[in-house]
């Protein structure tokens, strides 16, 4: 690439840097980008660059594949209902060990390797996420039945004071999705849903979902069917038609929840693409799917 082209790329980002200066972006970090070393580097560099150009990234991470591996090593079989992990006491201890004990620290170390200042938290830190036990329902034979997911929670409220202080002090917060209930008992939270609630509570400009797919497509096997921009009503029609199914539905519900709580836009990008977050934010066309309110 010649030097002029490099300059043009930098200049293309300028209006977006100006527009989003001092804004908060919540990044839900999951999927392949968490287990591939090169992808980890791309994400870490993207986050540090955002911070240095005046944007405030707040990371909420998952860890499904690593939790599954840890469970299998201990002779437990992972079980999911509607994309949510069934969590007994032993599973919860494994989840906390992997999320708080390993993944969170690894992300913090990677950010600091590239010049960022970062602090690892969980929803327990500073009473960040108060949660309640989630009640899940299934439809069987046209009958609505309640299913016990175990120690799985849903966000009741988010206290942003601690995260606000860290952002103001130029740190990149990294949050594990573990909440506490009114009895101070730990609950496992779906990371997508927690990220949406945190984004809403933080008055974030954007929620960016780093996933294993390019975005929302009519045909998952045909990249040409990728939608660059969708509204909530268009998304809801795609769910009705069965285009969006399975584990993608909790992600979409989290996206819609964030938009309804005041987040201006939600983006779904593929963490397997080098610097996908920067390409989505700082280029006209973007690289994934942007979702907006109607």
Curated annotation (Swiss-Prot):
Site feature: Transition state stabilizer: 28, 251
Predominant cellular place of this UniProt entry's protein = cytoplasm
One Gene Ontology term from the biological process aspect of the record:
L-arginine biosynthetic process
Q: Where in the cell is it found?
A: Cytoplasm
- What InterPro entries does this protein map onto? AceGlu_kinase-like_sf, AcgluKinase_fam, ArgB, Asp/Glu/Uridylate_kinase, Glu/AcGlu_kinase, NAGK-C
GO molecular function terms listed in the Swiss-Prot or TrEMBL record? acetylglutamate kinase activity; ATP binding
State which Enzyme Commission number(s) the record gives: 2.7.2.8
Known CDD domains for this protein?
A: AAK_NAGK-C
The annotated pathway is: Amino-acid biosynthesis; L-arginine biosynthesis; N(2)-acetyl-L-ornithine from L-glutamate: step 2/4
* Catalysed reactions, semicolon-separated: N-acetyl-L-glutamate + ATP = N-acetyl-L-glutamyl 5-phosphate + ADP
The answer to keyword Disulfide bond applying to this record is no
Q: Which UniProt keywords apply?
A: Amino-acid biosynthesis, Arginine biosynthesis, ATP-binding, Cytoplasm, Kinase, Nucleotide-binding, Transferase
Q: What class of enzyme is it?
A: transferase
Q: Which residues bind substrate?
A: 63-64, 85, 188
**Please, which domain of life does this record's source organism belong to?**
Archaea
- What GO CC annotations are associated with the protein? cytoplasm
HAMAP family xrefs: ArgB
Q: Give the similarity note.
A: Belongs to the acetylglutamate kinase family. ArgB subfamily.
The protein's role, per its UniProt record: Catalyzes the ATP-dependent phosphorylation of N-acetyl-L-glutamate.
Q: What is this protein called?
A: Acetylglutamate kinase
């Amino acid at each position: 690439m010649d030097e002029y082209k490099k300059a043009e790329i930098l200049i293309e980002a300028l209006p977006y840097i100006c527009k989003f200066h001092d804004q908060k972006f919540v990044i839900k970090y999951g999927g392949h980008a968490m287990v591939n070393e090169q992808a980890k580097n791309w994400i870490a560099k993207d986050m540090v660059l955002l911070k240095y150009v005046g944007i405030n990234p707040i990371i909420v991470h998952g860890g499904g594949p690593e939790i599954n591996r840890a469970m299998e090593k201990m002779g437990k079989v992972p079980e999911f209902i509607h994309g949510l992990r069934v969590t007994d006491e032993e599973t919860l201890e494994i989840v906390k060990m992997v999320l708080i004990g390993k993944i969170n620290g690894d992300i913090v170390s990677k950010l600091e390797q590239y010049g960022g200042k970062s602090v690892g938290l969980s929803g327990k830190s500073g009473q960040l996420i108060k949660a309640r036990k989630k009640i899940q329902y299934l439809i069987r034979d046209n009958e609505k039945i309640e299913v016990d997911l175990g120690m799985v929670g849903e966000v009741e409220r988010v206290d942003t004071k601690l995260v606000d202080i860290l952002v103001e002090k130029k740190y990149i917060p990294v949050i594990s999705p573990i909440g506490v209930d009114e009895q101070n008992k730990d609950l496992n939270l779906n990371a997508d849903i927690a990220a949406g609630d945190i984004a809403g509570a933080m008055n974030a400009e954007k929620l960016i979902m780093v996933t294993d797919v390019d975005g929302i497509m009519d045909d998952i096997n045909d990249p040409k069917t990728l939608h660059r921009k969708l509204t909530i009503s268009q998304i809801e029609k795609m769910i009705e038609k069965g285009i969006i199914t399975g584990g993608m539905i909790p992600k979409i519900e989290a996206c819609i929840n964030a938009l309804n709580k005041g987040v201006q836009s939600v983006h779904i990008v593929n963490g397997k693409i080098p610097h996908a977050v920067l390409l989505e934010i700082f280029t006209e066309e973007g690289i994934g799917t942007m979702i907006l309110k109607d």
